[in-house]
């Protein structure tokens, strides 16, 4: 069974990180760090489709499953990243149940969906096994998506709802904020968690680090990103530079 699906089925929160920098070396570092999963970001990161096979191999070298955030609800792209060996797909800007259904259909082979069979890196012995194992998260990032929460959550084939706090805040008319701490954003996240639980699904989101993650776990979030390769690199540089400056 997909390790992500197994952990979530057991009711445990899971923690991962974003792989934003293109190339297998940073992906390998994250894959070997002991996270429950790694998300390769092909929407806002520097990762393009041509980078994915070696990056997926690098993450999986550490025994870690990889999820790919695709650029949009584009069935051919969704199918392709799964052919490349992704354990799951994160689809941005899903606003309606129809869009969620289109994404779900692209992740499953007939009779459950429209996924075309490709053997690029497939390790599955049957299409039924692949359909049961894949994990699909759809991102809730707009006021429209909040209005359609229950319908999106109830969509067959959708496994989780993932809050995109920055875009969601902007859609709600809030100033740019990376913490998700504004009261309307907190309320929106709690609404997503409740909708996911009503549908027997799980909720996920981006965190500002371990302390923020602990708060979100208490509020019912079970799929949480702790950071990104770029952020870890930036923090390490700043720390060492500050230490060096103190010696001058």
Regions found by a protein language model. Give the residues of each.
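Hydrophobic faces of well-ordered beta-strands that scaffold small-molecule active sites
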Residues: 13-18, 38-40, 66-69, 89-91, ...
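Alpha-helix-loop-beta-strand connector modules within alpha/beta enzyme cores
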Residues: 49-83, 107-112, 130-131, 181-203, ...
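Active-site beta->alpha loop and helix N-cap motifs at the rims of alpha/beta catalytic domains
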Residues: 26, 31, 35, 60-102, ...
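N-terminal amphipathic alpha-helix/helix-capping segment at the start of soluble metabolic enzymes
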Residues: 1-20, 126-132, 190-198
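Glycine-rich, proline-tolerant flexible connector loops at the mouths of alpha/beta enzymes
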Residues: 26-54, 163-181
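Conserved anion-binding
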Residues: 76, 86-176
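C-terminal alpha-helical cap/extension of soluble enzyme domains
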Residues: 74, 115-124, 134, 140-144, ...
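Short, acidic/polar
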Residues: 19-33, 72-80, 143-155, 208-214
């Amino acid at each position: 069974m997909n390790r992500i699906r197994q952990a979530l089925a057991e009711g445990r929160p899971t923690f991962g990180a974003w792989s934003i920098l293109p190339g297998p070396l940073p992906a390998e570092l994250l894959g070997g760090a002991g996270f429950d999963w790694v998300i390769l970001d092909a929407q806002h990161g520097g990762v393009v489709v041509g980078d994915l096979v070696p990056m997926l191999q690098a993450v999986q070298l550490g025994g870690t499953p990889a999820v790919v955030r695709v650029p949009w609800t584009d069935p051919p792209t969704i199918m392709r990243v799964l052919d490349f060996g992704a354990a799951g797909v994160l689809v941005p800007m899903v606003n309606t149940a129809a869009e969620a259904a289109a994404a779900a259909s692209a992740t499953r082979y007939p009779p459950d969906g429209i996924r075309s069979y490709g053997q690029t890196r497939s390790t599955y012995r049957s299409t039924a096994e692949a359909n049961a194992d894949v994990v699909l998260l759809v991102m809730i990032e707009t006021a429209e998506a909040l209005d359609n929460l229950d319908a999106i959550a109830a969509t067959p084939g959708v496994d989780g709802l993932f809050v995109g706090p920055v875009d969601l805040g902007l859609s709600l008319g809030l100033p740019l904020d990376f913490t998700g701490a504004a009261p309307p954003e907190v309320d929106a996240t709690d609404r997503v968690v409740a909708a996911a639980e009503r549908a027997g699904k799980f909720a996920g989101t981006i965190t500002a680090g371990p302390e923020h993650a602990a708060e979100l776990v208490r509020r019912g979030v079970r799929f949480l990103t702790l950071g990104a390769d770029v952020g870890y690199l930036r923090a390490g540089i700043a720390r060492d530079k500050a230490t060096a400056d103190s010696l001058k």
